């Protein structure tokens, strides 16, 4: 029984497929059958998308033309034909000048045509509302300002490390952090540097009035190095310039002369007392020298750097003084040493006047107690 269409319909249906499956069923369909179908579907989708875009474009209602637009519609075509090399912006400038040059009588027909188009537009679209394609400039500026503020704010996940590197926790990077020089860091990074340097000073115990005198002797010897001159200027009390320079020069002379004095007489109690006295006095910038040693430093108070002859003479005088102090009675030397700081500073201590050196209170303890008491009253002056 033959088909009613004579087999044309079956041939049309099998055009997308090859005839090999009919003759050789084991080979299956041809490889180019599915790509052809997929290409056809893609074309259909593109056609549908273009139809939708056209529908949207047609759905958009255009505004009615004004008189200038009605006149420029034909005039722009004429100018474009006469000047094919000119840009559209140049054509618009020429059209604007030509429109302004027209008289009211010449503009009247275009104005009437624009009014007719406006009335027709109102009749065709009674509920028309103008919707501009471009947003207003004010909204754009506001959005730019808010975006700028968000960019200016630091991210919450940004953490500044102690070594001055910025780590972003939100980004999962497969490589390690790279170190950058401090010059490339942002401005805000240097505010964290004091916190990074603070742990270096945790090991030092700063002397306070509540600490005992023995803590000064047991402290780290590295802390009692030669102090900078800024500490002497930042002390709460102040003397005249000559007295301060006298103390600083005396401190430098004592530091240079102490090793020589130790080499000449080892094991002397006088040298031991002077060695114990030098450490806290050098730190606080106050020199408690005996009257004889202070007398030799007075002529050098006004000089910034004494000549080498004066240093040699002072060194020889100091060696002679050490020899003389070794021959002085021990109790007499302790008596002058314990009260020399009070007499020089001009302060009266009622609580320390009655202290008498005994077997327990040796020269070291008396020197340390006098030094700690003087430092306490100098750092905390009475109102």
From Swiss-Prot:
Disordered: annotated span: 1-20, 37-58
Matches recorded under InterPro entries: HMG_box_dom, HMG_box_dom_sf, Sox7/17/18_central, Sox_C, SRY-related_HMG-box_TF-like
Domain Sox C-terminal: 267-382
Intrachain S-S bonds: none
Keyword NAD: no
Sequence motif 9aaTAD, residues: 331-339
Domain of life: Eukaryota
Residue ranges of DNA binding: 61-129
Protein name from the UniProt record: Transcription factor Sox-17-alpha
